[in-house]
């Protein structure tokens, strides 16, 4: 069974993620590596990518401390991964796209010119994400009903997103999502925004994932919407509001 309690074998890990992500896990936690669990896979995939992205910007001493130097015997490959594993998982989840073509449709629209041919490592990651979603995410997917206050916030978010100009950046979208969340019960009085106003608590972003996607958490919502498409996100909110009406 693929339940949480059972460890994975190395072969199973490699059904869901690259050998490099497994090497990173082993490198970081040599003692823990005797027990592999599925829920640490996404973080290790994305952390590996971050270490790789950062490598060329580091000086010699920092490079020696970077796990990718050890994983690749001092010769890490060039990094170019336009999306994260966590984002791919959320795309599969939101679109129920259990095929690579649909996912590549989103990626190609978001980053024109990026194809399975130009980015074979990303193509492999798309396959891993579909396997991971099928075995670990889909079986536990549960949409929760929004409260009345959350419904009102979702309606406002839907309206604000539909006003955005085409081609809005992930940053622009994230700002809109943040602005709409700046209300009770999501205000965070401790974490102030740049302008000194109350910040927005994680509960707001978690609610979006729980209600819209049936999962506990996800990547930055603005980044997700930028790849998924604003119109698709608006339809997704409409679906959630209709489901809970």
Each language-model region and where it sits:
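Basic, alpha-helical terminal appendages of large translation-related enzymes
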Residues: 104-245
């Amino acid at each position: 069974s693929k339940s949480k309690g059972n460890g994975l074998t190395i072969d199973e890990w490699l059904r869901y993620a690259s050998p490099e992500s497994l090497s990173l896990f082993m490198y970081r936690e040599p003692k823990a590596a005797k027990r592999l669990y599925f829920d640490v896979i996404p973080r290790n995939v994305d952390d590996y990518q971050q270490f790789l992205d950062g490598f060329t910007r580091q000086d010699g001493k920092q490079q020696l401390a970077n796990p990718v130097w050890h994983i690749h015997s001092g010769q890490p490959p060039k990094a170019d991964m336009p999306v994260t594993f966590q984002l791919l998982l959320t795309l599969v989840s939101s679109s129920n796209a259990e095929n690579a073509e649909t996912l590549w449709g989103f990626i190609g629209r978001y980053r024109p010119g990026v194809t399975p041919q130009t980015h074979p490592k990303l193509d492999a990651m798309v396959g891993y994400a579909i396997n991971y979603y099928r075995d670990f995410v889909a079986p536990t997917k549960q949409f929760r009903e929004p409260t009345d206050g959350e419904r009102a916030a979702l309606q406002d978010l839907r309206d604000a997103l539909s006003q955005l100009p085409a081609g809005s950046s992930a940053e622009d979208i994230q700002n809109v999502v943040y602005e709409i969340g700046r209300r009770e019960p999501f205000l965070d009085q401790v974490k102030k925004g740049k302008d000194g106003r109350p910040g927005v608590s994680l509960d707001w972003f978690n609610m979006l994932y729980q209600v819209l996607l049936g999962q506990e958490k996800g990547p930055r919502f603005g980044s997700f919407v930028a790849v998924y498409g604003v119109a698709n996100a608006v339809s997704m909110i409409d679906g959630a509001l209709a489901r809970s009406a």
